[in-house]
C-alpha cells in the first residue's frame, strides 16, 4: 500500500491544474509544466485539493505507480510556485568556473577546460568562480544537470578535491602508510 499515494495535495493560490485525458498541465507564477500520467490512477479534484485513487487491481506495480504519480504532481506544483535550486562548490587548487552565454566552462584539473551546454529550461548563475547555482521549475531536470556537472570531477576520497553539492559531506580516507 502506497502511503505517499494517498496523501492529499493542496493547490496553492496562483497555481492552476488542468487535465486533458492523460496529460496534466500545471501553471503558476514561475511557468508551466505538462506531463503524461497513466490512466490507471484516477485523479480527483475537490476544490483546491487533489487525491489520487488507484483503479483496478492494487498489486506492487500499481502501488509504485500510485505513489510516483502523486509525488510527480506535487513536485510540478512546487516547481511552478517556488522553483528548485541546487548549489555546487568547486574544491581544489586552481579549480574555477565561468559562464559564457549558454555554456558553463569548468577548469577542474584537466589539461583543457570542460564546456557544458546549459539546457534552455535551466538557469545557471556563477556568483564567484568556485560556486555554481542551478535553478529551474522541473525538479528532475535541475537534479540531472547538477549530477551531470558533478560527474565531470566528482570528489575524491583522499583530499576531497572535486565538484560537490553545497551541503555534501565527503568522508576522507587515510592514505597508504610506509613500512
Curated annotation (Swiss-Prot):
Induction: Expression is induced 2 fold by treatment at 45 MPa for 30 minutes. The keyword Endoplasmic reticulum does not apply. InterPro entries: Ribosomal_uL6-like, Ribosomal_uL6-like_a/b-dom_sf, Ribosomal_uL6_a/b-dom, Ribosomal_uL6_bac-type, Ribosomal_uL6_CS. GO terms for molecular function: rRNA binding; structural constituent of ribosome. Keywords: Ribonucleoprotein, Ribosomal protein, RNA-binding, rRNA-binding. The keyword rRNA-binding applies. GO terms for cellular component: cytosolic large ribosomal subunit. GO terms for biological process: cytoplasmic translation. It holds the Pfam family Ribosomal_L6. NCBIfam families: L6_bact. Belongs to the universal ribosomal protein uL6 family. This protein binds to the 23S rRNA, and is important in its secondary structure. It is located near the subunit interface in the base of the L7/L12 stalk, and near the tRNA binding site of the peptidyltransferase center. This is Large ribosomal subunit protein uL6. The lineage of its organism: Bacteria, Bacillati, Bacillota, Bacilli, Lactobacillales.
Amino acid at each position: 500500500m502506497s502511503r505517499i499515494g494517498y496523501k492529499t495535495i493542496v493547490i496553492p493560490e496562483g497555481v492552476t491544474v488542468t487535465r486533458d485525458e492523460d496529460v496534466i498541465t500545471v501553471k503558476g507564477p514561475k511557468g508551466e509544466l505538462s506531463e503524461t500520467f497513466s490512466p490507471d490512477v484516477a485523479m480527483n479534484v475537490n476544490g483546491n485539493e487533489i487525491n489520487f485513487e488507484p483503479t483496478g487491481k492494487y498489486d506492487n506495480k500499481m502501488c509504485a505507480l500510485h505513489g510516483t504519480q502523486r509525488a510527480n504532481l506535487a513536485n510540478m506544483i512546487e516547481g511552478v510556485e517556488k522553483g528548485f535550486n541546487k548549489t555546487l562548490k568547486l574544491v581544489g587548487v586552481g579549480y574555477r568556473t565561468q559562464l559564457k552565454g549558454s555554456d558553463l566552462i569548468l577548469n577542474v584539473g584537466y589539461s583543457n577546460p570542460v564546456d557544458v551546454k546549459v539546457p534552455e529550461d535551466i538557469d545557471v548563475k556563477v556568483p564567484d568562480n568556485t560556486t555554481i547555482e542551478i535553478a529551474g521549475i522541473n525538479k528532475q531536470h535541475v537534479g540531472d544537470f547538477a549530477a551531470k556537472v558533478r560527474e565531470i570531477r566528482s570528489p575524491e576520497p583522499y583530499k576531497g578535491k572535486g565538484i560537490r553539492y553545497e551541503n555534501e559531506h565527503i568522508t576522507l580516507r587515510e592514505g597508504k602508510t610506509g613500512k
